[in-house]
Amino acid sequence: MIAIASIHYPISNRKHSHRGSWAKIWANILEADVVYGNDDYEKYDRVYIYHGMEWSGSFNLFGGAKDVTQFQRFLDSKCVFFSLDIDMPDYGAIGKSRLSNCSEEWANFDWDALTEKCKTITKVKMSDLKLCHLIVGDSHANSVYKGKSMVDRHDGKTLHGALMQGLNYYVEPYYHSNLNKVTFYFGNIDIRHHILRYADGSEEELMATYEEELKRVQDRYGVKLAVVAPLWIENESRKLPKSGYYDGTPFYGDWEDRNRMREFFAQRIEAMCDVNGWEFKQHSESLKNDKGELDFECMEKPKSVHLSPKYYMEEL
């Protein structure tokens, strides 16, 4: 039996949690259970340690450095552990760094033993899986997940930035003899924050470069391609966390202009897919309200730019 579990913070079971979707994607790939909250994982043979989508190198401890229950459980466990996505952090060193302001229980815990256990744990990355399908994109890539696919997620990456790097750069670490399809999903961030800052027709050049880069991927790796159109645009009243701001604002350009740009991107992507024999994909029209806006009900609660996992192309 296999489980996905977190040691330093509880995995959320909220069905609208975009952050929680990464654990569910891993669970789908590994055919594993997700251990939510502080539930026990001792009945499992193998446990893959989930560090969250945005591991910062420290513990986010509600109420301060007091409770060591989860660390003691991990230290005592006989399960075989693996670290998802990143090298196993030194939880012992992180715990010791909080000794100046902590509970007696925290101060007396054997952090050195925890360090030694962390050293024994092997990292598992998506690129180790050698699956047939790869999805490459920004943080919205989760929303187009299809069962048993590798996901190469680059939070905050614009289409422009990805093209400057070259799309082959993202495929190369995942390439193997079984890889036969790659799906690309970029562009939402460009539309939200960047492309309307330039009144020089740069969107035409961006789409032309996108097509050329996609051709390079197909020529080099001989894979089928799918390209996803940008997500529908939500109403401007949507409250967003400051992490979604750029240059102090939640978006640049009004709804009409950004929607026009989204339609341009979608039309050009569909046209290049038609000409080159690639698959064109876009989110369901049912995600829009009667004004043509992305419905808040379909978005992560309480505030985010992302879809709720309930409304992904394939519900997790």
Where do the protein language model's features map onto the residues?
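Catalytic core of nucleotide-activated saccharide and alditol-phosphate transferases
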Residues: 65-130, 231-233
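Surface-exposed, active-site-proximal loop segments in enzymatic domains
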Residues: 61-63, 95, 191-202, 236-250, ...
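Active-site segments of SGNH/GDSL-like serine hydrolases
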Residues: 81-95, 187-190, 216-258, 285-290
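Extracellular serine-dependent O-acyl
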Residues: 82-84, 224-231, 260-298, 316
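Conserved SGNH/GDSL esterase-like catalytic core that processes O-acyl groups on lipids
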Residues: 11-12, 16-24, 28-31, 40-50, ...
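Substrate-gating cap/lid alpha-helix
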Residues: 99, 235-284, 304-305, 310-314
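N-terminal pre-catalytic "stem/leader" segment of glycosyltransferase-like enzymes
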Residues: 1-51, 87-117, 134-135, 143-144, ...
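Well-ordered, non-membrane alpha-helical segments in soluble/globular domains
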Residues: 17-26, 58-73, 102-115, 163-173, ...
